[in-house]
Regions:
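Conserved alpha/beta-hydrolase
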Residues: 81-105
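Alpha/beta-hydrolase-fold enzymes
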Residues: 141-226
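The serine-hydrolase catalytic nucleophile loop
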Residues: 66-82, 265
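N-terminal cap/lid segment of alpha/beta-hydrolase-fold proteins
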Residues: 19-55
Length: 334
């Protein structure tokens, strides 16, 4: 009888396993058109770009955060937009809706942490072919930062010359309370398609209220998330937290004192790993920075720093956010 019960529960859990979006055979050379990034398995991911008036001095591949999409790099209420600002500074800027987000297929389903890292790497390779002999940079926001870390620390990293990690998603299981880990596992394996809204958490992502209101009205911005998608994101954050100290290119790590999304303790642990090999690695801490700092009311200050870092990773940042950044991060009150 006990054996039958065990088989029953095993079958039940298997039927409720976390779902990952399907992929096709990798039989296509990735390519980009005006509005599409065609992946190696034949999926059409929506893309957008902002180009400079003259020959670009650099190419930027921007990777959005969880539940967001490429619009996050465009002009938004009360913020100038990463794409337009960097294009005006001389960069060709590209962004895409990662699979499962925005206008891309399988919206709401977790695409798999290795798959979205592969998509980033393939897009970077495609841009490298399109713009030979021009530096290629990557900017990743939250989940996008975790994607970049995972791709760049793989056995076959893409040809990126420098990276900017904006409040990267490093809230790994090792930095979570045990109760959170248990609840996440149970939720993902018993009711994976359930969509808790998170409205009762009371967390604020930015001081740009008009931008937040605009996002809340945007049908492409995901407001209710499947539990198994959160589970998949946590797998990605595990990889990012484990590998952030292995970034092989000059990298700028940004974090804000008012970030209510990625906990400070997880960030401190990640930053210590990140600086274990300090050559080419910089940290900037913004006293007035929120999680969506590239869309905050003070976003332009951060964008000026990013531009300065990409032009010369060894020079101090114009804002001074890199001065005593780690000490200020560790002593900041939350």
């Amino acid at each position: 009888m006990r054996a039958l019960v065990a088989v029953f529960w095993a079958a039940t859990l298997a039927a409720c396993a976390p779902q990952v979006a399907p992929t096709g055979p990798y039989s296509i050379t990735p390519s980009i058109s005006e509005t599409i990034f065609l992946t190696a398995d034949g999926l059409s991911l929506h893309k957008r770009h902002w180009l400079p008036a003259a020959e670009p001095q650099g190419v930027v591949l921007a990777v959005h955060g969880f539940n967001d999409y490429s619009k996050s790099f465009d002009v938004v209420p009360d913020a100038p937009g990463v794409g337009p600002v960097l294009a005006a500074a001389g960069y060709a800027v590209y962004a895409y809706d990662q699979r499962g987000f925005g206008k891309s297929p399988h919206v709401g389903l977790w695409p798999g942490e290795n798959q979205i890292a592969r998509d980033f790497a393939d897009f970077a390779l495609t841009l490298d072919r399109r713009y030979p002999n021009i530096p290629l940079y990557a900017i990743g926001v939250s989940m996008g930062g975790a994607v970049i870390i995972t791709a760049m620390t793989s056995d076959d990293p893409p040809p990126v010359d420098a990276a900017v990690l904006v409040a990267p998603a490093v809230w790994s299981r090792s930095t979570m309370p045990f109760s959170y880990r248990i609840a996440l596992w149970l939720g993902a394996h018993t009711m994976p398609s359930a969509k808790p809204s998170g409205r009762g958490l009371g967390r604020q992502a930015s001081d740009n209220i008009e931008m937040l209101r605009d996002a809340s009205r945007d049908l492409l911005f995901i407001k209710e998330t499947r539990i198994d998608s959160i589970y998949g994101l946590t797998n990605l954050m595990d990889l990012a937290q484990s590998n952030v100290g292995r970034m092989p290119v000059p990298t700028l790590y940004l974090y804000g004192a008012k970030d209510q999304i990625i906990p400070k303790n997880a960030t401190v642990i990640a930053v210590e790993k990140f600086l274990s090999e300090p050559k080419g690695r910089r940290v900037a801490f913004y006293d007035n920075g929120w999680h969506m700092m590239l869309r905050d009311l003070d976003a332009e200050r951060v964008l000026v720093d990013i531009d300065a870092f990409l032009k010369d990773p060894s020079q101090p940042l114009p804002s001074g956010a890199d001065i005593d950044a780690v000490e200020r991060l560790k002593t900041a009150k939350k």
